[in-house]
Curated annotation (Swiss-Prot):
It comes from Byblis liniflora. Belongs to the intron maturase 2 family. MatK subfamily. Usually encoded in the trnK tRNA gene intron. Probably assists in splicing its own and other chloroplast group II introns. The lineage of its organism: Eukaryota, Viridiplantae, Streptophyta, Embryophyta, Tracheophyta. This is Maturase K. The keyword Lipid metabolism does not apply. InterPro entries: Domain_X (IPR024937), Maturase_MatK (IPR002866), Maturase_MatK_N (IPR024942). It holds the Pfam family MatK_N. Transmembrane segments: none annotated. It is found in: Plastid, Chloroplast. The gene is matK.
Length: 513
């Protein structure tokens, strides 16, 4: 066990300092409002336009520590809800400041670069989620088994604080964070008397920056076991798509962790099975996938090891059913809005040596990505583009818009779906989805003009909608039709549009467009 602790031991000099006094330094707020700093951390989408100030934050923190805690009574619910709203506002301001202080260490390299070059540099902190698929195509086809791991969510606030203790020295900052989360969770339990997940979801919506920092830290701790496996195997390729919550807010991930195996001294499992020579790891949102060439017995040992480790390390009960073992050769898995699988193509080659001919059976593995037709149709039905059977219907709520706006809305949805699922191995199901949207658009226009679809298209011409729903592949075919056959073969193959930076609703069939 001493050898295991050395692998993930983080030196004191490399720990990240949380300087509690920074919260009470006025120049930090001027720094946060600086244009260059805002751009450097992509704050245009993070809400840095909130004009919090040093004086306001100082008063709010003092009031949070000194206030008399109120108790909700059934006779005076309106007054208490008013106080709760004020407290919500206070906590939101404090969380903004806390997240701002947290992001400063990640932004300093870009600020220094701006001063050196005397110009604003916007870091490439966003990656396409489709950058993961080339990794899968190159590597997953050589593997046999897949382990799908569902990371526990939501997380108890105390577990988050305990996780940060391993790489944050400042006790004052941790005390403030613990007190803040404790107050906020209690407050939400009063306002929303539902499950704990509702409280955590409300917290993530009101405090997105702080929530993302805490959640990323939590996921990094869960991935610590995979970092240990990478140290054990030189062939491990650990890749994270970085779409934990649709956008990347971390500029770098913690590569080394402190005392990961602190509590492992209480059990001594035989770790010989982690010597697997070839494994691959990829994660997105709250799902992690680990593929290997190993046997089913090896994967079962991994599952037992993961469950035991996480239960001891996080002091919580980790349900074994959150880890699924799948055979890649005969089972598909849902990944980033695709039904992915490893398909085996069998071919027979006739060979001849010294006048003797014989047949050679070859098996070529290919990574397939299919459009999940049934979940996609369910999403379209939920959004009122078709019924549950997939028959297109009109969109009455859009009938009051102009024709150009109606066509533009349908075109955008169709284009986004076409872009997102451009790398699909088989396009028939994608064409069906596009057909539903196209006919739904025609029915909506016909409903607006109080006519039938046939009469409307006959009056304006059937080419009206074809131009709007022309896919990029059709454009490529028109552009390169007269070019060399090599170009034609390239554009007939799968095309990954790497401008996709988030799952949005396309990757989540349960949500609505």
């Amino acid at each position: 066990m001493e050898e295991i602790q050395i692998y993930l031991q983080l030196e004191r000099s490399q720990q990240h300092d949380f300087l509690y006094p920074l919260i009470f330094q006025e120049y930090i707020y001027a720094f946060a409002h600086d244009r260059g700093f805002n751009r450097s951390i992509s704050s245009e989408n993070l809400g840095y336009d909130n004009k919090f100030s040093f004086l306001i934050v100082k008063r709010l923190i003092s009031r949070m520590y000194q206030q008399n805690h109120f108790f909700i009574s059934l006779n005076d619910s309106n007054k208490n809800l008013f106080c709760a709203r004020n407290k919500n506002f206070d906590s939101q301001i404090i969380s903004e400041v806390f997240a701002c202080i947290v992001e400063i260490p990640f932004s300093i390299p870009y600020i220094n670069l701006e001063w050196k070059k005397k110009k604003i540099v916007k870091p490439q902190n966003l990656r396409s989620i489709h950058s993961t698929f080339p990794f899968l195509e190159d590597n997953f086809s050589h593997l046999n088994l897949l382990v799908d791991i569902l990371i526990p969510y939501p997380i108890h606030a105390e577990i988050l604080v305990q996780t940060l203790r391993y790489w944050i020295k400042d006790a004052s900052s941790l005390h403030l964070l613990r007190f803040f989360l404790h107050e906020y969770c209690i407050l939400n339990s009063f306002i929303i008397p539902k499950k704990a997940s509702s409280s955590f979801s409300n917290f993530s919506k009101r405090n997105p920056k702080l929530f993302l920092f805490l959640y990323n830290s939590h996921v990094c701790e869960y991935e610590s076991v995979f970092l240990f496996l990478r140290n054990q195997s030189s062939h491990l390729r650990s890749t994270s798509s970085g779409v934990l919550l649709e956008r990347i807010y971390f500029y770098r991930k913690i590569e080394r962790l402190v005392n990961t195996f602190v509590k492992l001294k209480y059990f001594q499992p035989n770790l010989w099975f982690v010597k697997e020579p070839y494994i691959h790891y990829v994660s997105y949102q709250k799902i992690a996938s680990l593929a290997s060439k190993g046997t089913s017995l090896l994967m079962k040992k991994w599952k037992c090891y993961f469950v035991t480790f996480w239960q001891w390390y996080f002091s919580l009960w980790f349900h074994p059913k959150r880890i699924y073992i799948k055979q890649l050769s005969n089972q598909s898995f849902y990944f980033l809005g695709y039904l992915s699988s490893v398909r085996m193509n069998f071919s027979v080659v006739r060979s001849q040596i010294l006048g003797k001919s014989f047949l050679i059976n070859n098996v070529i593995k290919k990574f397939d990505t299919l459009v999940p037709t049934i979940p996609m149709i369910a999403s379209l039905a939920k959004a009122k583009f078709c019924n549950v059977l997939g028959h297109p219907i009109s969109k009455p709520v859009w009938a009051d818009l102009s024709d150009s706006h109606i066509i533009d809305r349908f075109w955008r949805i169709c284009r986004n779906i076409s872009h997102y699922h451009s790398g699909s191995s088989k396009k028939k199901s994608l064409y069906r989805i596009k057909y539903i949207l196209r006919l739904s658009c025609a029915r909506t226009l016909a409903r607006k003009h109080k006519s039938t679809v046939r009469t409307f298209l006959k009056k304006l011409g059937s080419e009206l909608l074809k131009e709007f729903f022309r896919s990029e592949e059709d454009v490529f075919s028109l552009t390169f039709h007269k070019a060399s056959p090599a170009f034609w073969e390239v554009y007939r193959s799968r095309i990954w549009y790497l401008d996709i930076i988030c799952l949005n609703d396309l990757g989540n069939p349960k949500s609505q467009f």
